[in-house]
Amino acid sequence: MVDEGILREVYRVLEDRRDRPIDSYTSRLMRDDDKMAEDKILEKIGEEAAEVIIASKNDENLVEEAADLIFHTLLLLVYKGVPLDSLLEEFAARRK
């Protein structure tokens, strides 16, 4: 079983792509410092959410599509400057 350390690792990579852009898919999505970058990320989240719904109905690729949705959601949090700990603390608060 994998622990939440993998989320931290993915989050660090996303932060690195934001802070030291290279020619990668992730860097390109965050490249614009204006509303266009955010809109592109939000559009991807919408696409991935739809793909999760379709995968759920077809019982195909659900895990892969869910991972894509979570990845793009984390990308949005990084773009907006939200620390990963804020997300984890919110999950912890909901357990109570």
UniProtKB/Swiss-Prot annotation:
Keyword Chloroplast: no
Reaction equations catalysed: 1-(5-phospho-beta-D-ribosyl)-ATP + H2O = 1-(5-phospho-beta-D-ribosyl)-5'-AMP + diphosphate + H(+)
Keyword Transcription regulation: no
Pfam families in UniProt: PRA-PH
Annotated GO biological process: L-histidine biosynthetic process
Gene3D superfamilies: MazG-like (1.10.287.1080)
Enzyme Commission numbers on file: 3.6.1.31
Molecular function per GO: ATP binding; phosphoribosyl-ATP diphosphatase activity
Organism domain of life: Archaea
Localisation per UniProt entry: Cytoplasm
Gene Ontology CC terms: cytoplasm
Keywords: Amino-acid biosynthesis, ATP-binding, Cytoplasm, Histidine biosynthesis, Hydrolase, Nucleotide-binding
Pathway: Amino-acid biosynthesis; L-histidine biosynthesis; L-histidine from 5-phospho-alpha-D-ribose 1-diphosphate: step 2/9
UniProt xrefs under HAMAP family: HisE
Family listed: Belongs to the PRA-PH family.
Protein name: Phosphoribosyl-ATP pyrophosphatase
Origin species: Methanothermobacter thermautotrophicus (strain ATCC 29096 / DSM 1053 / JCM 10044 / NBRC 100330 / Delta H)
